[in-house]
């Protein structure tokens, strides 16, 4: 089924107008438009209390602040609020403050929207420091849990290796940022997580290892039922695929298996429980953004999918948005989706680090 492609807003320039949005497939009644363009390498997003949209980047080294200066509901002001950073992919907003994750640290910009309004040079403090400096899988997705703690992943610095912690973990920081506990271990590279709105449990995606073939291993959707659980890396992948280098003598029963095997090399990024009211009930489930494969003979991913849950069991996993990948032609792609950010009206923003835009996905009715 195909939804609608809506006209772009005032913040959209010629580059976005050239994107083939008509190639995107959405369920009937849904629409997609470019919300903000010219945000190269757009990654994680966070929304301020006054409506400022903060966007981190990876290779660009910048953080953007996007605002609606005239109150018409359309972004029209873009500011590069930080530059020259080391892969500032992750951003999170809490109680007026913006948190920006680089590879080895997390900055805190107190009262950020007031700072931006003042026009003065932005001040910040280091909230977290001293994390590993390895760049491979070192970029971060960060977020605050319902417990008020900041969760920060530290990816494995390799395709496959057995390095000491905090590598291959998700860390939960104390409220002052000075200490942490290992909340999940055996996590190769998570770039997205969210908390179940009912149970409060952390669900996260994990990117599987490479160089084992086109079909092995599958990437994972996982659920943390007890702090400190081990999810298998580097000994097992997708629950039961024994690693040829590190799996000998290990028992898969000693590790937590995934809730869902997502597919080989699909590269899951954001995991988002939809809690808005504007989508029909059939679409108020768990959305997973698949960034797309890079080392598979036929590409896979490059889409947003929806996992339908019954309790903690996934009973269906189906496409929600696809069309960025031209599988039927030359296996080329024109976009790679990354992160989802809900808006107050129930629509979802979706960043794209390849096209350098942020889309808005909304339900407009049948």
What residue ranges belong to the model's regions?
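Beta-propeller domain segments
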Residues: 17-26, 139, 156-160, 173-178, ...
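A short loop-to-beta-strand structural motif that recurs across blades of beta-propeller domains
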Residues: 22, 62-65, 97, 105-107, ...
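Surface loop/turn motifs at the tips and blade-to-blade linkers of beta-strand repeat domains
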Residues: 34-39, 79-84, 127-134, 182-186, ...
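Beta-rich catalytic cores
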Residues: 41, 49, 77, 84-87, ...
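Conserved beta-propeller blade signature
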Residues: 52-56, 97-100, 149-153, 201-205, ...
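Acidic, glycine-anchored loop motifs typical of Ca2+
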Residues: 71-77, 116
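Asp-box/WD-like beta-propeller blade repeats and closely related beta-sheet repeat scaffolds
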Residues: 92, 104-145, 153-156, 184
């Amino acid at each position: 089924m195909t939804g609608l492609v809506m006209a772009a807003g005032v913040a959209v320039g010629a580059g976005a107008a050239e994107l083939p949005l008509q190639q995107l497939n959405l369920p009937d009644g849904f629409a997609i438009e470019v919300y903000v363009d010219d945000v190269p390498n757009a990654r994680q997003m966070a929304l301020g209390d006054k409506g400022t949209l903060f966007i981190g980047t990876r290779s660009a080294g910048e953080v953007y602040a996007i605002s609606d200066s005239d109150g018409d509901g359309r972004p029209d002001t873009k500011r590069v609020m930080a530059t020259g950073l080391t892969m500032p992919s992750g951003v999170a907003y809490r109680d007026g403050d913006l948190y920006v994750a680089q590879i080895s640290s997390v900055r805190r910009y107190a009262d950020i929207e007031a700072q931006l309004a003042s026009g003065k040079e932005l001040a910040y403090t280091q909230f977290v420091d001293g994390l590993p400096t390895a760049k491979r899988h070192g970029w971060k997705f960060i977020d605050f849990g319902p417990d008020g703690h900041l969760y920060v992943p530290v990816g494995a610095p390799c395709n496959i290796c057995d390095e000491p912690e905090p590598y291959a973990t998700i860390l939960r920081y104390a409220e002052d940022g000075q200490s942490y506990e290992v909340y999940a271990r055996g996590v190769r590279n998570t770039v997205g997580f969210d908390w179940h709105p009912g149970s409060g449990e952390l669900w996260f995606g994990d990117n599987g290892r490479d160089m084992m073939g086109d079909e092995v291993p599958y990437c994972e959707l996982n659920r943390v039922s007890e702090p400190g659980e081990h999810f298998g890396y580097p000994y097992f992948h997708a629950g039961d695929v024994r690693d040829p280098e590190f799996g000998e003598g290990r028992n898969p029963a000693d590790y937590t298996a995934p809730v869902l095997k997502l597919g080989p090399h699909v590269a899951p990024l954001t995991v988002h429980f939809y809690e808005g009211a504007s989508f029909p009930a059939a679409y108020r489930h768990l959305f997973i953004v698949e960034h797309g494969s890079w080392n598979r003979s036929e590409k896979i991913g490059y889409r947003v999918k929806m996992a339908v849950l019954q309790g903690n069991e996934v009973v269906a996993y189906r496409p929600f948005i696809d069309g960025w990948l031209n599988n039927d032609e030359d296996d080329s792609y024109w976009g790679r989706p990354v992160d989802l950010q809900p808006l107050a009206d129930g629509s979802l923003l979706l960043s794209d680090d390849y096209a350098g835009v942020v889309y808005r996905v909304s339900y407009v009715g049948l």
